[in-house]
Amino acid sequence: MLSPKRTKYRKHHRGRMRGKASRGNTVVFGDYALQSLEASWITSRQIEAARRAMTRQVRRGGQIWIRLFPDKPVTMRPAETRMGSGKGAPEFWVAVVRPGKVLYELKGVPESVARVALRLAASKLPVKTQILVK
């Protein structure tokens, strides 16, 4: 699973997801891409599950690029803990995704295979997506 090797701060604010993606919203590396249509947090587990689903479909021929990275820690408190005594410990990592962000790119396979692979990956993610062709 993806996570940063080291960070400047251990805990982040939750923040808000306003507006559209101004960067990372075009197909750069591959011929086909999966683009987000909604704003959401995508966990490192979801990123990995989608990658595995795509890899299984594409086999050896294709090349896959993951265009997002989970760099935001999400903290959680232990179950049945009283209020107070500070913020919880970091539990998992998320990537903040805004509408328009390209999530995955694919190259080296026929369009039919690419569409099936990207649709499988999309089913593992918590956002509505569309498939782009370069």
From Swiss-Prot:
UniProt-listed InterPro entries: Ribosomal_uL16, Ribosomal_uL16_bact-type, Ribosomal_uL16_CS, Ribosomal_uL16_dom, Ribosomal_uL16_sf
Pfam families, sorted: Ribosomal_L16 (PF00252)
GO CC annotation: chloroplast; mitochondrial large ribosomal subunit
Subcellular location: Plastid, Chloroplast
Entry-linked CDD domains: Ribosomal_L16_L10e
Keywords of this entry: Chloroplast, Plastid, Ribonucleoprotein, Ribosomal protein
Keyword Oxidoreductase carried by entry: no
Gene3D superfamilies (UniProt xref): Ribosomal protein L10e/L16
MF GO annotations: rRNA binding; structural constituent of ribosome
GO BP terms in the entry: mitochondrial translation
Region (Disordered): 1-21
Superkingdom per UniProt: Eukaryota
Location, primary (coarse class): plastid
Similarity comment text for this entry: Belongs to the universal ribosomal protein uL16 family.
Subunit field text: Part of the 50S ribosomal subunit.
Designated name of the protein: Large ribosomal subunit protein uL16c
Species of origin: Chlorella vulgaris (Green alga)
